[in-house]
């Protein structure tokens, strides 16, 4: 048994791929007998992130975090995010001479550039500074690994993702009956997800958006012909995937795109841009169509084989993802 500490600024009740990944990996690690402790924002005084009020940022967490770390006495520490908790944990580890691993879940420089016009060069300077002392900077895909190494990162290792193919399946009864073909988006409804590139497509059929976020009310007003459901979970989420004919993934800033695997597990071909995330998730998949013209990718996906989508999703497993995570950790 290993005592593993995970420090993360992204945690419940947030709904995103980072939280889903961490929760699932922790579950698998605990089932194998490892002791896993999480230090998360709910343990501290927090303030809302101005652009995303649902994201809570810890205020001056370092002193309390040091006490929490000492109380748990971990054998391995993983810092999952570059927020206040991540920086505090990093500082504590460096002061004590401890080794630690990190992960890169979001293209922070692109996110900051999109939401706050922070120059990409400055964003990557901050990210490189944060991760450079890490013994292993875990990234989700080979294309992201290659991109970061071209930017001068030297400590990256690949940590791919999985999907629950029992929950997300081709047998679920569709939650909605909409005019076909039905094009589905699932995920955060926020500016960096580039959802309007999907909503502006002039194509026959219906568009379904499942998820919540800061742009939801605005998009509901601007696109009255689109069906917005808000967030869905578990069996209900699977049923909403099954309401669609294809899945559209318009983001150009994700490092992976877990929702693509969930959609394919439900038998939905995927249309996306040829960027980091889709380039890896959809590689060698005949049911994944990528094009800089998103409408063209959608039209191709509508002709793709649903069984091929499901078969591709079956190649990704959470146990394998958890094993990779564990092997990437380093003793203090």
What residues fall within each predicted segment?
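Donor nucleotide-sugar binding/catalytic pocket of nucleotide-sugar-dependent glycosyltransferases
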Residues: 125-171
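Short alpha-helical donor nucleotide-sugar binding micro-motif in glycosyltransferases
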Residues: 131, 231-232, 239-244, 325
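Conserved donor-binding/catalytic core segment of Leloir-type glycosyltransferases
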Residues: 175-208
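Nucleotide-activated donor-binding/catalytic signature segment of Leloir-type glycosyltransferases, i.e.
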Residues: 217-235
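Aromatic "clamp/platform" in nucleotide-sugar-dependent glycosyltransferases that forms part
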Residues: 252
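Short hydrophobic beta-strand element within catalytic cores of glycosyltransferases
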Residues: 269-272
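A charged, aromatic-enriched C-terminal amphipathic alpha-helix characteristic of glycosyltransferases
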Residues: 303-331
